[in-house]
Design a protein with these regions (language model features):
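Low-complexity, Ser/Thr/Pro/Gly-enriched N-terminal "stalk/linker" regions
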Residues: 1-38, 49-73
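Well-ordered alpha-helical scaffold segments within catalytic/enzyme domains
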Residues: 1-3, 41-55, 93-106
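Carbohydrate-binding/catalytic loop surfaces
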Residues: 24-42, 72-98
Length: 106
């Protein structure tokens, strides 16, 4: 496998992720300001693979700041505020994947 070649080919996707990360650390799913925790975590995995640690750390901090006392996170955010006021049980534990990815690289 030519790891460097694949990383190079996917660099535009990484640039898109970085461009769509807001100052609060959330990573927008689209240009309209939507952010959902599942897609956010997938973007964190990419940031870890590319060792973009500043953006990665901001994204992890955003995720944990938005967990409630029960360890759940709202299903969707729009322009930095919750827009769907319910929880999907698989969103909160998904953060383990970007954390594990980072631990494998560090």
């Amino acid at each position: 496998m030519n790891w460097d070649k694949y990383k190079s080919l996917l660099r535009p996707a990484l640039d898109w992720i970085i461009k769509n990360q807001l100052n609060d650390g959330s990573i927008q799913w689209d240009e309209k300001g939507k952010c959902d925790p599942w897609d956010h975590c997938e973007c964190l995995i990419a940031l870890a693979i590319y060792e973009e640690w500043e953006a990665y750390d901001k994204g992890v901090e955003w995720f944990f700041k938005n967990l409630n006392d029960d360890g759940l996170i709202f299903s969707e955010y729009q322009n930095c505020k919750p827009s769907k006021f319910y929880f999907e049980c698989h969103h909160a534990p998904y953060i383990i994947f970007p954390l594990k990815q980072a631990s494998l690289l560090n």
